[in-house]
C-alpha cells in the first residue's frame, strides 16, 4: 500500500494537539484541526470525506486520535491504525503527563511513534485488516458515521484539500487493488491445501479399514 496512503496523524487532549506527524505539505493539518472542533459527542468514531481523502477520528477518555488517508486506503486500516496508536499512547502516558501537557509538547517523544505506526500499517495491510476483524473492541467499520466535510465546517464553497502529492502517492489506488488480489490468491491456496490434507486423511482411513478387515490384501 505504501506509507504515502497515510498522510497525517495526531493525538489531542480535547482540542489541544499534543503530538502530530506528517511527511507532506498542505492545508490538511488545519482542516483536521477544524474537524476536531466539530466532533459529535454521541459517537467515539467518526470519518469525514474531503477531495479524495478521509479524516478518521477515534475519541477515548478525553483524548482524540486522528489519521488522514487517501480514500482508496479504505476505512478498516485507518481505524485499526487509530486503535494501535491509542493503545500505545495509553501505555506510555495513561494517568501521566498527557493530562496536563501543552500543545505539541509531546511531539519529540510521540511524533516518531506516530511515524512508526503509520509505516507499519502501510507495510502490513493484510495483517492489519485481519487483526481489526478479530479484535472484539474494534466495532465494524461500516458503523462509523460518515458526513460531508463541508457541512461540518459550515462552509458553502467546496473545500480544496491541498496535499503535496508525489508520483508514488498517485499510484496508491492501484497498489491497494493489487494487495487485495494477492490476499485473495493466498487465501485460495490455503483453502485448497486444507482440502487436500482432509482428502488425504480420508483416503488413509479408508485404506486402514480395508486392510484391517481383509487382513492385508488377502480378501476372499
Curated annotation (Swiss-Prot):
One of its GO terms (cellular component) is plasma membrane. Residues 130-190 form the v-SNARE coiled-coil homology domain. Expressed in flowers, leaves, stems and roots. GO terms for biological process: protein transport; vesicle-mediated transport. It is a single-pass type IV membrane protein. SUPFAM superfamilies: SNARE fusion complex, SNARE-like. Residues 218-220 are vesicular. InterPro entries: Longin-like_dom_sf, Longin_dom, Synaptobrevin-like, Synaptobrevin-like_transport, V_SNARE_CC. It is found in: Cell membrane; Early endosome membrane. The chain crosses the membrane at residues 197-217. It holds the Pfam family Synaptobrevin. Residues 10-114 form the Longin domain. Residues 1-196 are cytoplasmic. Keywords: Cell membrane, Coiled coil, Endosome, Membrane, Protein transport, Transmembrane, Transmembrane helix, Transport. Belongs to the synaptobrevin family. Involved in the targeting and/or fusion of transport vesicles to their target membrane. This is Putative vesicle-associated membrane protein 726.
Amino acid at each position: 500500500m505504501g506509507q504515502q496512503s497515510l498522510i497525517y496523524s495526531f493525538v489531542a487532549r480535547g482540542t489541544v494537539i499534543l503530538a502530530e506527524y506528517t511527511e507532506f505539505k498542505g492545508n490538511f493539518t488545519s482542516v483536521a484541526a477544524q474537524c476536531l472542533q466539530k466532533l459529535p459527542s454521541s459517537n467515539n468514531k467518526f470519518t469525514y470525506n474531503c477531495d479524495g481523502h478521509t479524516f478518521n477520528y477515534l475519541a477515548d477518555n478525553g483524548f482524540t486520535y486522528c489519521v488522514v488517508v487517501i480514500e482508496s486506503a479504505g476505512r478498516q486500516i485507518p481505524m485499526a491504525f487509530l486503535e494501535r496508536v491509542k493503545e500505545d499512547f495509553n501505555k506510555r502516558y495513561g494517568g501521566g503527563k498527557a493530562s496536563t501537557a501543552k500543545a505539541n509538547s509531546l511531539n519529540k517523544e510521540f511524533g516518531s511513534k506516530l511515524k512508526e505506526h503509520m509505516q507499519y500499517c502501510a507495510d502490513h495491510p493484510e495483517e492489519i485488516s485481519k487483526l481489526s476483524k478479530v479484535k472484539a473492541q474494534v466495532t465494524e467499520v461500516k458503523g462509523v458515521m460518515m458526513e460531508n466535510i463541508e457541512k461540518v465546517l459550515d462552509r458553502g464553497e467546496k473545500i480544496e484539500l491541498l496535499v503535496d502529492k508525489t508520483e508514488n502517492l498517485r499510484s496508491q489506488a492501484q497498489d491497494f487493488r493489487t494487495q487485495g488480489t494477492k490476499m485473495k490468491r493466498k487465501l485460495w491456496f490455503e483453502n485448497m491445501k486444507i482440502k487436500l490434507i482432509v482428502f488425504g486423511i480420508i483416503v488413509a482411513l479408508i485404506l486402514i479399514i480395508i486392510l484391517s478387515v481383509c487382513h492385508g490384501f488377502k480378501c476372499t
